[in-house]
């Protein structure tokens, strides 16, 4: 199969929106598009995986592609010749992502909906529209005697991870969000943003407070 069929970009959209009376501009767009085109030389194989019969699910890993929409999924699907590991999902659904007070959500309200099952206001983290704290998947898991943790590639005070452990009406209240990790109860937390855990304006050292609760604090992978 010719690899060039999966060139991704805005070429078709841009050329389609141009009038036929502008051939020179259309050619320029086509030339520029080559600078913004991705070609996947070696697509990966996606084996078919089925859930074993007669066995219950023991562990759940919730993966959030922050900001990922159907457009991103479809682009990846197209680049890999119409195959993704997502195709092995036992159940696939869609959600309406608007928040309680806006048509377009943010990571605070959107992540809260995922973490707690309840919609809230724009910029709110782990609280309902009235500002009341909501129990997250972390909290509910611990109440059932299960282990629960968070591992992120961003800062821990970013709204998406904070939605699972923190409670605030402002996702930008970074020092307060970080302080909430002391009472989060998660067994395992990995992420960035160490500067907000120590040398804080309020004089607290969140690392020391976590250690006092029995956590082992590591500042490197070694």
Residue spans of the language-model regions?
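Bacterial N-terminal signal peptides that target proteins for export
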Residues: 1-10
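C-terminal segment of classical bacterial N-terminal signal peptides
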Residues: 15-23
């Amino acid at each position: 199969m010719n690899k060039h069929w999966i060139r991704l970009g805005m070429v078709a959209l841009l050329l389609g929106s141009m009038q036929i009376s502008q051939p020179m501009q259309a050619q320029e767009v086509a030339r520029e598009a080559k600078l913004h085109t991705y070609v996947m030389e070696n697509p990966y194989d996606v084996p078919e995986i089925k859930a074993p019969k007669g066995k219950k699910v023991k562990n759940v890993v919730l993966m959030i592609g922050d900001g990922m929409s159907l457009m991103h999924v479809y682009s990846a699907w197209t680049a890999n010749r119409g195959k993704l590991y997502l195709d092995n999902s036992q159940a696939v659904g869609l959600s309406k992502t608007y928040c309680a007070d806006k048509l377009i959500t943010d990571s605070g309200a959107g992540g809260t909906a995922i973490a707690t099952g309840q919609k809230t206001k724009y910029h709110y983290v782990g609280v309902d529209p009235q500002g009341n704290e909501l129990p997250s998947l972390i909290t509910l898991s611990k109440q059932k005697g299960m282990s629960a943790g968070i591992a992120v590639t961003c800062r821990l005070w970013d709204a998406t991870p904070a939605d699972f452990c923190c409670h605030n009406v402002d996702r930008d209240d970074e020092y307060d969000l970080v302080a909430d990790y002391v009472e989060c109860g998660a067994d395992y937390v990995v992420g960035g943003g160490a500067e907000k855990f120590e040398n804080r304006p309020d004089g607290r050292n969140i690392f020391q407070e976590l250690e006092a609760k029995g956590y082992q604090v590591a500042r490197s992978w070694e």
